[in-house]
Curated annotation (Swiss-Prot):
Protein name listed in UniProt: 3-oxoacyl-[acyl-carrier-protein] synthase, mitochondrial
EC number(s) per entry: 2.3.1.41
Catalytic residues identified in the record: C209 (for beta-ketoacyl synthase activity), H348 (for beta-ketoacyl synthase activity), H385 (for beta-ketoacyl synthase activity)
Domain Ketosynthase family 3 (KS3): 41-458
Annotated localization: Mitochondrion
Annotated coiled-coil segments of the chain: none
High-level lineage: Eukaryota, Metazoa, Chordata, Craniata, Vertebrata
Source species: Homo sapiens (Human)
Family designation: Belongs to the thiolase-like superfamily. Beta-ketoacyl-ACP synthases family.
């Protein structure tokens, strides 16, 4: 028998063996309550959080303001916004005072010229998260074992429009050599990787409003499956501009309520659209034994990650919430958790009539009678909708809820409709009370029908 034939038979035999093994693993998994595939590998915990949000900059300062019922939504000023139906947004506060964002605290003046605003915000959030975690890899081995996954939902449109205008009116030489790097969605991850010499997986996600959740979930799997020991994961977006607001307004996605304190009101009968926000959130995810060995403070554990697609409409969710239901079910399945073990859901709920209703239906259909024992809240009344950063911000809020055992409120929810009959943590924060482990879900859904759910638990 020739060597070629022998090698061919070996390869064929190996493929058949692998196929049978995969079939056996799949056949042993039920819908809920099985040994999750991720647990056949390694546990993943969260040891650091960095937040750059409309509520401020930091970790515990932002959390305290969230729990205190504060909001970062403000009125838009300037003639350029006068013709746009939406007149509110949620800006990151700029300045040098406590809780304000000063770009020069994180990058040099020359870097500011070569980087976009969302990239700088991501660098700031990453620095805060790594400092919070106490993880600063110095050796080659530690750098190779640490990766980055930071996504961006939208490129900064004003950079494109201003560059196009300069090119058309002033010519080729007025196009910045940094134009292309500024608008690449992977540049936030790339800059963080370069800055800290992180040589593990270098990953960027761009899945609209699900970006941040996908980045955190993908990082969870990178660690669980041994691609890294530590991941610096999150999302960033900073695209509040007349052009982006006009685009979302034309899509009838934004609130037209001119009162910044009432414009974003998830689950409310008079909700009429979301409020655009900006910011970045980065979490340090770490293999459990790695964190224990270096005596890191552990906020929570990531138990599972679910994904789904609506396959329905470019902007509207499935009206029955079928995609959202499958997404949450997939996260429970991955975590090996029963629906009755969940006691909190950080809802995607952006304050749109269709989206909030669909998510509410999905929760009630999946959890059945147990839905009435759940607490469900949306934090977007406080932060606005941070688009590509939203999923990471809300993963951070769910993590902190597990750690402090407090549930962030749904602001502005002073009345409800008959179908919205769950505990939405209205107006004020609540103590998280359960006789079981503190386990929550956080949902993110985006244009194009892209969905993600993370299952996060206290230790």
């Amino acid at each position: 028998m020739s060597n070629c034939l022998q090698n061919f038979l070996k390869i064929t035999s190996t493929r058949l063996l692998c196929s049978r093994l995969c079939q056996q693993l799949r056949s042993k998994r039920k819908f809920f309550g099985t040994v999750p595939i991720s647990r056949l590998h390694r546990r993943v915990v969260i040891t650091g959080i960095g937040l750059v949000t409309p509520l401020g900059v930091g970790t515990h300062l932002v959390w305290d303001r969230l729990i205190g019922g504060e909001s970062g939504i403000v009125s838009l000023v300037g003639e350029e916004y006068k013709s746009i139906p939406c007149s509110v947004a949620a800006y990151v506060p700029r300045g040098s005072d406590e809780g304000q964002f000063n770009e020069q605290n994180f990058v040099s003046k020359s870097d500011i010229k070569s980087m976009s605003s969302p990239t700088i915000m991501a660098i700031g959030a990453a620095e805060l998260a790594m400092k919070d975690s106490g993880w600063h890899p110095q050796s080659e081995a530690d750098q190779v074992a640490t990766g980055v996954a930071i996504g961006m939902g939208m490129i900064p449109l004003e950079v494109v429009s201003e560059t196009a205008l300069n090119f058309q009116t002033k010519g080729y030489n007025k196009v910045s050599p940094f134009f292309v790097p500024k608008i690449l969605v992977n540049m936030a991850a790339g800059q963080v990787s370069i800055r800290y010499k992180l040589k593990g997986p270098n990953h960027a996600v761009s899945t609209a409003c699900t970006t941040g959740a996908h980045a955190v979930g993908d990082s969870f799997r990178f660690i669980a499956h041994g691609d890294a020991d530590v991941m610096v994961a999150g999302g960033t977006d900073s695209c509040i501009s007349p052009l982006s607001l006009a685009g979302f307004s034309r899509a009838r996605a934004l609130s037209t309520n001119s009162d910044p304190k009432l414009a974003c009101r998830p689950f409310h009968p008079k909700r009429d659209g979301f409020v655009m926000g900006e910011g970045a959130a980065v979490l340090v995810l770490e293999e459990y034994e790695h964190a224990v060995q270096r005596r890191a403070r552990i906020y929570a554990e990531v138990l599972g990650y679910g994904l789904s697609g609506d396959a329905g409409h470019i902007t509207a969710p499935d009206p029955e919430g079928e995609g959202a239901l499958r997404c949450m079910a997939a996260a429970l399945k991955d975590a090996g958790v029963q629906p009755e073990e969940i006691s909190y859901i950080n809802a995607h709920a952006t304050s749109t009539p269709l989206g909030d209703a669909a998510e509410n239906k999905a929760i009630k259909h999946l959890f059945k009678d147990h839905a009435y024992a759940l607490a469900v809240s949306s934090t977007k009344g406080a932060t606005g909708h941070l688009l590509g950063a939203a999923g990471a911000v809300e993963a951070a809020f769910t993590t902190l809820a597990c750690y402090y055992q407090k549930l962030p409120p749904t602001l502005n929810l002073d009345c409800s409709e008959p179908e919205f009959d769950l505990n939405y943590v209205p107006l004020k924060a609540q103590e998280w009370k359960t006789e079981k482990r503190f386990i929550g879900l956080t949902n993110s859904f985006g244009f194009g029908g892209t969905n993600a759910t993370l299952c996060i638990a206290g230790l």
